[in-house]
Amino acid sequence: MMSIWDALREKQAQVSDRSILSLFDDPGRAQEYSAKTGDLFFDFSKTNIDDEALNLLSGLLDASGMAQKRTAMFSGQPINDTEGRAVLHTALRNLDGGPVLVNGTDVMPGVLATLERMRVFAQGVRDSDVTDVVNIGIGGSDLGPAMAVAALSPYHDGPRCHFVSNVDGAHIADTLRGLDAKKTLVIVASKTFTTIETMTNARTARAWMTEHGGDPKAQFAALSTADDLTAAFGIPPERVFGFEDWVGGRYSVWGPIGLSLMIAIGPRAFDAFLRGGQAMDRHFQAADWRENLPVLLALVGVWHAQVCGCSSRAVLPYDQRLAKLPDYLQQLEMESNGKSVQIGGADVTVDSGPIVWGAAGTNGQHAFYQLIHQGTRVVPCEFLVAAEGHEPELAHHHNLLVANCLAQSEALMRGRSIEDARAKMVQAGFTGQELERQARHRVFAGNRPSVTLAYPKLDPFMLGQIIALYEHRVFVEGVILGINSYDQWGVELGKELATSLQPIVDGEAPADGKDGSTAQLVGYVIANRG
């Protein structure tokens, strides 16, 4: 494996000063460095990857056993080996119902039965006088459905959906303010029904509903496997939707965690969403690596993060309804691949997954693109753009949006030379030393890599494809890094310390044994309460 990494580093050193734009001297460059599945088009030609680099990268697939591990995942083997679990979120979108075995048992009858229960429940809510749905969850129980509900707003024909995640009381207070407690459904999304943020918010919502004339027993639902705890909370079993331990939180929007989405867009549109994910599953399993979108997206990511040393990756959807996608992918990628230990217990020998961030275009252009274009750090960018929007009467808006997206990817690659900057300053009337000074501020180094995902329109099927694409990208990158992408031990220590700090913050215990900084901060908080 290391010999491939060494060859990749040597290759990167050879091409680091090469102009990406010069690669387009080959008239076939754009077509050769693009791929497509269905209507989803991936262009990675604006990177400094050439045939030699791509072939070296593909060597990582063989060396890591990616194909075999992909088969293991889809066949229900426990590839989440630190927890001894299968990884089968793909089964949630297996609408054809073909057998998927875990420990010799076909899980699909249970998956399809739960899906049908969801359909009946969701349609019942849609047919009732419920006007608002409040989903209470955090992490994967919030980011996925919140992102998908926003993304598919043109397809909403059900109750309004709201999402509460933060334990900060301001979040639930602001959300519940103005809602009719008698016409609100509250969904509590917590697999264990013990997540402290979620349960704190759930108890507050229950008290609010009771105080304002609602009936929590009839107006609460739970997405959980803890039947005893949901019953103790007062939620009838017919209003509880469980899922198995082989569905990780950040991969769970396809099942019961997606109930709020199903209520918003309806069961038929939700099925289309599932079919989009299933279509990407089939593409990922069947397509040759050179035409395989998840594999190519992963290899480009590895080139930039692990070979070129780029520490972050910007996700830039030129689609306002995908404004929450960067946050969703931040959890999906950073919680999955932000690891420093390989599966066998050895240290990861290359950089792990990058920092993932971003914002919707064109908003980001007026916020952080300055750094992307002229900063000292190279930030690989991933653009997403639809050929058309959902508002035909606003087509001129969408055309301007698309023009901005394509212009940004071109500008990142092309840059602006000092000669061009000087010419502009001459036209502006500058001369002498001031001309030179002003020109330098207008130079763009260029050679900043980007990829673009393009699609006809953001509909449920396409959203399903896009989410599954990124899920499988995470899998491939994790396999190449030799890590388990499906645990998240890094979130545990802070939660444990928060539990021990709670009585100290409450003023019920001394700060003995705490470091000076923590003790000082607790003291400040206690002293400054009203």
Curated annotation (Swiss-Prot):
Pathway: Carbohydrate biosynthesis; gluconeogenesis; Carbohydrate degradation; glycolysis; D-glyceraldehyde 3-phosphate and glycerone phosphate from D-glucose: step 2/4. The keyword Oxidoreductase does not apply. One of its GO terms (molecular function) is monosaccharide binding. The active site is at 335 (proton donor), 366, 495. It is an enzyme of class 5 (isomerase). Keywords: Cytoplasm, Gluconeogenesis, Glycolysis, Isomerase. It is found in: Cytoplasm. It catalyses: alpha-D-glucose 6-phosphate = beta-D-fructose 6-phosphate. It holds the Pfam family PGI. SUPFAM superfamilies: SIS domain. Its EC number is 5.3.1.9. One of its GO terms (biological process) is glucose 6-phosphate metabolic process. One of its GO terms (cellular component) is cytosol. PROSITE patterns: P_GLUCOSE_ISOMERASE_1 (PS00765), P_GLUCOSE_ISOMERASE_2 (PS00174), P_GLUCOSE_ISOMERASE_3 (PS51463). Catalyzes the reversible isomerization of glucose-6-phosphate to fructose-6-phosphate. Belongs to the GPI family. This is Glucose-6-phosphate isomerase.
